[in-house]
């Protein structure tokens, strides 16, 4: 049986399509800008489209009004997207259909194991419920791994090897609390939107092999991946909403854009005060070099909570 109709994305051409997909758990900070700017420049330098998706499928983590603020921040920093914003909260039917297809193909199963049990055996799920034929009551849904992906090629970093046990784990695609898992939603939506290359932060390297395994189960073409360096605070922690990284400044966006370009190893206008945001970005697109982007994380105290 072929995947249901909605899962097919008819590609009319071979145009490059990139995306930025923030979760509305708070405002964008400097680390978020790195991911947004890097994906934007890579798409525009390839004469491609740049899409924005709001990943609002985890209501307990969402901050009211954050999604709208994120969109305003992107516009303030000159990062204008193509087409309509895709909201994951409006895509539940697609995720349900994907889950149903996987279940019909015998590629998923219900699991009632608790987090405490999994932690007691070392933190990696052991397939305990694979042959127990549980029903959906008080159960999560796990993928039945067929061909685990243990490595992938990153267009910046080369071949990346995954932890073998993690790669072979039957991971959750629908949570016990009824929420759709990130790995399922992101794969279904990236395919639906025709994304050809995913440019994001290096903190998302780990789930990549799981996402590739889902692409393969569905029989879809796997996109290319680029994982950008992370901005760290002076304590060595990633700038994040959880670590209280300050929101992007609401004033003149140009000095922050210049700092982000320099962070990514790119040529920046020496006399940026003489240029508009649009001109700075046009120059950045023209001079974009992926090979100049550093692979390692960088401490950036200027935009961390240490400077607040």
Swiss-Prot record:
Residue sites binding Zn(2+) per the record: 111, 113, 125, 129
Binding site for ATP: 241
Nucleotide-binding listed as a keyword: yes
Gene behind the chain: gluQ
Motif annotated as 'KMSKS' region, chain positions: 238-242
Name recorded for this polypeptide: Glutamyl-Q tRNA(Asp) synthetase
Enzyme Commission number(s) of this protein: 6.1.1.-
Gene3D superfamilies, alphabetized: HUPs
UniProt xrefs under PANTHER family: GLUTAMATE--TRNA LIGASE, GLUTAMYL-Q TRNA(ASP) SYNTHETASE
Short sequence motif 'HIGH' region: positions: 22-32
Residues of the signal peptide: none
GO biological process assignments: glutamyl-tRNA aminoacylation; tRNA wobble base modification
Binding site for L-glutamate: 19-23, 55, 182, 200
């Amino acid at each position: 049986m072929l995947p249901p109709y909605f899962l097919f994305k008819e590609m009319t051409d071979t145009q490059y399509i990139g995306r930025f997909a923030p979760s509305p758990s708070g405002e964008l900070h400097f680390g978020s800008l790195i991911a947004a700017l890097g994906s934007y420049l890579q798409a525009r330098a390839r004469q491609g489209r740049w899409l924005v998706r709001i990943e609002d499928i985890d209501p307990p983590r969402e901050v009211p009004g954050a999604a709208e603020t994120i969109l305003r921040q992107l516009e303030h920093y000159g990062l204008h997207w193509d087409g309509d914003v895709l909201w994951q909260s409006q895509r539940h039917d697609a995720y349900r259909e994907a889950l149903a297809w996987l279940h019909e193909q015998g590629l998923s199963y219900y699991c009632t194991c608790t987090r405490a049990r999994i932690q007691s055996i070392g933190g990696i799920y052991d397939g305990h419920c694979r042959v127990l034929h549980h029903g959906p009551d008080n159960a999560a849904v796990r993928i039945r791994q067929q061909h685990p992906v243990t490595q992938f090629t990153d267009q910046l970093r080369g071949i990346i090897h995954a932890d073998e046990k993690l790669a072979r784990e039957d991971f959750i695609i629908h949570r016990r609390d009824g929420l759709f898992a990130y790995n399922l939603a992101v794969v279904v939506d990236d395919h639906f939107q025709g994304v050809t290359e995913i440019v994001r932060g290096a903190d998302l390297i780990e789930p990549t092999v799981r996402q590739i395994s889902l692409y393969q189960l569905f029989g879809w073409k796997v996109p290319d991946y680029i994982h950008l360096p992370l901005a760290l605070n002076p304590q060595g922690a990633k700038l994040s909403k959880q670590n209280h990284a300050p929101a992007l400044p609401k004033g003149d966006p140009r000095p922050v854009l210049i700092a982000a370009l320099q962070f990514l190893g790119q040529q920046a206008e020496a006399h940026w005060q003489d240029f508009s945001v649009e001109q700075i970005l046009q120059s950045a697109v023209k001079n974009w070099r992926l090979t100049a982007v550093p692979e390692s994380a960088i401490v950036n105290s200027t935009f961390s909570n240490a400077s607040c």
